[in-house]
């Protein structure tokens, strides 16, 4: 018998480095990487039933109802790649009601990784971000400055990358996370995200490796 595949949820505030870690996890563990936002865009582009319904809400400037998104997530998790190789659910659920909807469908992860980065570092990471309108490349004034003066002179800041906007986004994020804690409290693992990319991944890798080991032991003992 094959071991039960890995099922992982990951969450992190804006600029916590979650996107980078997801890429590393996906590459090493071959998990189906599922982001609700990407799913939503794909379904809308494909003109599916869920996509059409979601689009109606978005065009009115309203939030897409939980049931539509949960449906999309459920259908995606039923695809063969997610069933066979396991899955990485990225930045979802975001609220207690979304978590409950997944629980009702018996969709439960082995672990819920919470990337923990101090607020002042998150703010610094976001506020220092700059966009090169010519190439679309993202720079950071401190961590990855532009190669030359010419590029430096044309860099722009995205309108929602201001300190005020970041702090609002963080506030919303923390409220959302707070509401999830009760559902996942015994499987939440906080990983300090203020180290280097490799150091953060080493901790995640160790965690996922030990979960897989336990799953394999269970198979060999039955």
Curated annotation (Swiss-Prot):
It is an enzyme of class 2 (transferase). ATP binds at residues 15-20, 129, 195. GO terms for molecular function: adenylate kinase activity; ATP binding. AMP binds at residues 41, 62-64, 91-94, 98, 158. Gene3D superfamilies: P-loop containing nucleotide triphosphate hydrolases (3.40.50.300). It is found in: Plastid, Chloroplast. Keywords: ATP-binding, Chloroplast, Kinase, Nucleotide-binding, Plastid, Transferase. Catalyzes the reversible transfer of the terminal phosphate group between ATP and AMP. Plays an important role in cellular energy homeostasis and in adenine nucleotide metabolism. The maize enzyme also works with CMP, albeit with 10% of the activity with AMP. Belongs to the adenylate kinase family. This is Adenylate kinase, chloroplastic. It comes from Zea mays.
